[in-house]
Every structure is written in C-alpha cells, then in structure tokens.
C-alpha cells in the first residue's frame, strides 16, 4: 500500500490538507499528492504538510492541476472517489493496485464532469461524508487487504 498515490484535489482549507496528511501518513502511505490547492490550503496547508512529511520521512507532491499529476506519476489507473450522485459504481477494493492514483475531492461540490473523464469515478458510501471520511474508510479497507 505504500506505493499507492493518494491525492487531495481542489481544496481551499489548510485544516483539510493537514488532516488529510495525518490520516494518510497514519496508514503508512508514502506519498501524498495535492492538486489545485487554493487560498489557505496553498498558503499554510501545503507548508504544514511538507513539515509533517519531512518529520515522518514521507513524501508530498504539489501540482497545479490533476492532469499534471497524471502526466508525471503515470499511474496504471486513476480512481476519483466521490459521492453516489456523480459516480456510478461502488469501489471494488480488489481493483485498486499499488501503482494507482486515488483522488479525493476537497470541495463540497465534488468532481466536475470533465475531471471525472480523467479516471474511474467510484463512491464508498451512499451519502456524502467528504474527503476525510472517504479517505479514512478507503485506507482502512485497503489495509485489510495486506
């Protein structure tokens, strides 16, 4: 599970970036990717995440857009974890591999249709619980596979 790229996309909250890092690094994810961070997420969230990563011997990558992350990382598959209203299928945790990019949307509006075309849209639970809730459940389920 350490090789898997976990991404927070389209966030404006420094606190969300920090908590995302705590959860992901807590599950021994080696590299966190952040794309399209704005406002306090970019100004103070990313520096806080870098500090956390350095102290833990982990990595953080920051890209302007999701396309940049896909171009550089070259994942085998891209999973966009959203809510049921925009994603057709429930996550099958067995289809997620070590070299995949798993993207969680930090904005309450979710992914746009254009963003969903970049990968496989999946949902975890029936109701909207946000990026942090989805991340925690996702990583817990993935940790059971090991």
From Swiss-Prot:
Domain of life: Archaea
Annotated EC: 3.1.21.4
Keyword Hydrolase: yes
One Pfam family per UniProt: DUF2122
InterPro entries: DUF2122_RecB-nuclease-rel (IPR018665)
Molecular function in Gene Ontology: DNA binding; endonuclease activity
Disulfide linkage: none
GO annotation (BP), single: DNA restriction-modification system
Catalytic activity: Endonucleolytic cleavage of DNA to give specific double-stranded fragments with terminal 5'-phosphates
Keyword terms of this UniProt record: DNA-binding, Endonuclease, Hydrolase, Nuclease, Restriction system
Protein family per UniProt: To A.pernix APE2001.
Function as written in the Swiss-Prot or TrEMBL entry: A putative type II restriction enzyme, its methylase would be M.MjaORF1200P (AC Q58600).
Name of this protein: Putative type II restriction enzyme MjaORF1200P
Phylogenetic lineage: Archaea, Methanobacteriati, Methanobacteriota, Methanomada group, Methanococci
């Amino acid at each position: 599970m350490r090789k898997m790229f976990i991404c927070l996309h389209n966030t404006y909250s420094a606190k969300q970036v920090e908590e995302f890092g705590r959860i992901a690094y807590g599950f021994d994810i080696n590299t966190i990717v952040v794309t399209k961070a704005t406002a306090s997420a970019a100004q103070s969230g990313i520096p806080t995440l870098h500090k956390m990563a350095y102290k833990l011997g982990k990595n953080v990558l920051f890209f302007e857009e999701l396309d940049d992350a896909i171009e550089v990382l070259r994942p085998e598959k891209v999973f966009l974890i959203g809510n049921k209203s925009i994603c057709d299928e429930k996550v099958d945790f067995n289809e997620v591999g070590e070299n995949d990019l798993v993207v969680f949307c930090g904005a309450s509006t979710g992914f746009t249709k254009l963003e969903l075309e970049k990968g496989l849209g999946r949902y975890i639970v029936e109701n909207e619980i946000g990026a942090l809730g989805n991340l925690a459940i996702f990583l817990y389920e993935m940790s059971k596979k090991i």
